[in-house]
């Protein structure tokens, strides 16, 4: 079974990562499109050495370094994650994690998002899901897994006041569970914190 490594480590250090004997290929950047193509090629027993976003070792040890594909837009085009495997292996707790954005509006030099912006220079890496799509996923999770609270894992959850105002109304109406999220000192303004509180936010991290 081929072993693939993805995430920020191979994205930021591909040359180092692909040298590891335990990996047959690595994925740079977002993986949804690359994995879909890879599985289709494997199902059809076709070569997959030319799939964008993948670096693939062939039988001779040569590494095929493919180009990256554009970032996924809109994020609503990605199906909601299937969390049933987490239940099967006992990894789903009463506090369920979810993400509404990819990227960050800031470019702090010490942060991985600064690197992501450089990797995708020429594109805007920051994307935010529409409120109805987020609420739809939350409703499904609430109905299926009955969590006690949510944890939004966005690097910065509260930065778009208009989005937050719409989210606040919809979240209170359809979800109404406490949640945790991340903010920055520059986004922790009175109006944003008020909206978070009214939506049901019980704690934040900076």
Protein language model features and the residues they cover:
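Glycine-rich beta-alpha loop elements in corrinoid/cobalamin-binding modules
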Residues: 1-71
């Amino acid at each position: 079974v081929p072993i693939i490594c993805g995430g920020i480590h191979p994205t930021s250090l591909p040359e180092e990562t692909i040298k590891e004997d335990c990996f047959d290929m690595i994925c740079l950047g977002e993986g949804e499109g690359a994995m879909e193509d890879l599985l289709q090629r494997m199902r059809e027993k076709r070569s997959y050495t030319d799939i964008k976003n993948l670096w693939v070792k062939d039988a001779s040890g040569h590494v095929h370094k493919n180009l990256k594909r554009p970032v996924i837009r809109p994020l609503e085009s990605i199906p909601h994650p299937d969390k049933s495997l987490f239940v099967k292996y006992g990894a789903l707790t009463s506090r369920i994690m979810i993400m509404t954005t990819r990227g960050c509006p800031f470019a702090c030099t010490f942060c991985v998002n600064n690197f992501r912006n450089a990797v995708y220079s020429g594109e805007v890496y920051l994307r935010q899901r529409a409120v109805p799509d987020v609420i739809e996923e939350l409703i499904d999770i609430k109905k299926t897994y009955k969590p006690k609270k949510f944890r939004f894992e966005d690097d910065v959850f509260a930065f778009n006041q208009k989005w937050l105002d719409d989210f606040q109304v919809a979240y209170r109406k359809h979800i109404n569970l406490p949640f945790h999220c991340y903010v920055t000192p520059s986004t922790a303004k009175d109006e944003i914190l008020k909206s978070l509180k009214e939506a049901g936010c019980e704690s934040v991290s900076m």
